[in-house]
């Protein structure tokens, strides 16, 4: 809780919007079960030769987009990803895996959020906002969480495949 006290109002608002987009995505995906059909290939259906490093590279590159846009992209990305995933799982009668998918997504998206907060260092200088965040540590933790999410995702794909 001490960490939350150190965040600026802008960062707190962003975190609330970030978590809201995740919840809205899951709700939208469970209501609209045909949502995934518009872009079936975009949800990471396992391919031949999937590995932890391929999953990590894909998720890490998306997270660099978060960094470059100071996290704004992640609000849409959360909604889109979780809508597709929830909708796909319902259509495959595999909704029981949703908690695992949420765990994986949460690790990866919190990692992305940490990397996005790293992008706030630029915004902070631009708007002359002062915070006590160590952006190098945030970047490291973000990358580590994305890697852990990739490992769990790989293990899930192997068990389902």
Predicted regions: what is each one?
Residues 3-35:
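N-terminal signal-anchor transmembrane alpha helix
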Residues 26, 30-34, 67-92:
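Transmembrane alpha-helix/helix-exit interface in multi-pass inner-membrane proteins
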Residues 46-73:
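Interfacial helix-start motif at the membrane-water boundary
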Residues 113-129:
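Transmembrane alpha-helical segments of integral membrane proteins
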Residues 124-161:
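Terminal transmembrane helical module of multi-pass membrane proteins
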């Amino acid at each position: 809780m001490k960490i939350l006290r150190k965040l600026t109002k802008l960062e707190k608002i962003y975190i609330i919007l970030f978590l809201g987009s995740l919840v809205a995505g899951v709700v939208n995906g469970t209501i609209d079960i045909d949502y995934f059909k518009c872009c079936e290939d975009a949800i990471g259906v396992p391919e031949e030769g999937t590995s932890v490093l391929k999953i990590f590279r894909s998720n890490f590159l998306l997270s660099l987009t978060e960094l470059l846009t100071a996290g704004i992209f992640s609000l849409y990305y959360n909604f889109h990803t979780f809508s597709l995933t929830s909708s796909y799982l319902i259509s495959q009668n595999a909704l029981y895996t949703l908690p695992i998918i949420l765990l994986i997504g949460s690790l990866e998206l919190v990692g992305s959020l940490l990397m996005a907060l790293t992008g706030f260092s630029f915004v902070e200088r631009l708007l002359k906002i002062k915070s006590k965040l160590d952006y190098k540590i945030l970047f490291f933790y973000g990358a580590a969480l994305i890697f852990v999410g990739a490992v769990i995702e790989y293990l899930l794909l192997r068990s389902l495949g």
